[in-house]
């Protein structure tokens, strides 16, 4: 599986996880950046477009989801993206940040996202890291930090 195919499968799996999470009181509006003709593109947040953006208008809950392959978690580009996303969520009434990664990359994803959240004094924003088995995104493990 190429890097872009792997990223696309992570985005799709993350969108399904977010949509199916029990946090929603109502079905959320979900925007997913996979250009499949079935979903609209997520909005720009700062200068960055997340892979998934979900919102329940009635409860003001927003979830920003980002999928990262193993080689793309701990770098400047991701740091800038996550900074934009935590800035947005920090000023939202209710929000969560979700990160979808390959199974063996969960520790790095938790470390990077918690570090940026702490740097921005946004510890009140929940982080959910979903680690998927490569090639079988129905096998996953979830960490909420």
Predicted regions and their residues:
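Arginine/glycine-rich "motif VI" loop of SF2 helicases in the C-terminal RecA-like domain
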Residues: 86-95, 118-122
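Conserved catalytic cores of phosphodiester-cleaving nucleases, focusing on short active-site segments
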Residues: 52-78, 82-85
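Conserved beta-strand segments of the P-loop GTPase G domain that flank and frequently precede/overlap
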Residues: 65-68, 98-103
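Nuclease catalytic cores
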Residues: 1-19
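Active-site metal-binding core of divalent-cation-utilizing nuclease and nuclease-like domains
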Residues: 2-6, 24-60
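Well-ordered, non-membrane alpha-helical segments in soluble/globular domains
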Residues: 9-15, 76-85, 109-116
């Amino acid at each position: 599986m190429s890097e872009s195919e792997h990223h696309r499968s992570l985005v799709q799996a993350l969108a399904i996880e977010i949509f199916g999470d029990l946090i929603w009181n109502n079905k959320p509006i979900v925007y997913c950046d996979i250009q499949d003709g079935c979903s609209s593109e997520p909005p720009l947040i700062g200068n960055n477009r997340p892979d998934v953006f979900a919102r329940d208008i009635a409860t003001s809950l927003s979830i920003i989801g980002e999928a990262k392959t193993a080689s793309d978690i701990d770098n400047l580009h991701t740091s800038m993206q996550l900074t934009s996303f935590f800035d947005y969520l920090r000023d939202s009434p209710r929000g969560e940040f979700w990160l979808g990664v390959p199974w063996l990359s969960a520790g790095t994803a938790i470390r990077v996202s918690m570090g940026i959240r702490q740097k921005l004094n946004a510890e009140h924003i929940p982080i959910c890291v979903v680690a998927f088995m490569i090639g079988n995104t129905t096998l996953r493990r979830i960490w909420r930090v």
